[in-house]
């Protein structure tokens, strides 16, 4: 599970970059153990801003970030959408 501080940082940057929504998934949402990284799915960010968004999250969050662009259709992205937890949007 991620900290409230990390969640607030994610929400702050989601607003800054005007994303449609953010989904946490993987170890980021499991309560039984501490996550080694923060798994984030994002939809609605402009492609030219994706890596800037990623860099800011990587800089300010307490753990490494895995960022997935959910605007691309794939089985993995469908799984993230079905099993993850939406925290904004």
Task: Please identify what each model-predicted range represents.
Residues 1-23, 29-35, 44-89:
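Catalytic core of pol beta-like nucleotidyltransferases
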């Amino acid at each position: 599970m991620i900290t409230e501080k990390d969640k607030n940082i994610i929400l702050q940057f989601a607003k800054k970059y005007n994303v449609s929504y953010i989904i946490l998934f993987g170890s980021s949402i499991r309560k039984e153990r501490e996550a080694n990284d923060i798994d984030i799915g994002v939809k609605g960010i402009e492609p030219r801003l994706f890596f800037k968004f990623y860099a800011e999250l990587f800089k300010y969050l307490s753990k490494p970030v895995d960022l997935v662009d959910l605007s691309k259709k794939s089985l993995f992205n469908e799984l993230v959408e079905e099993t993850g937890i939406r925290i904004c949007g």
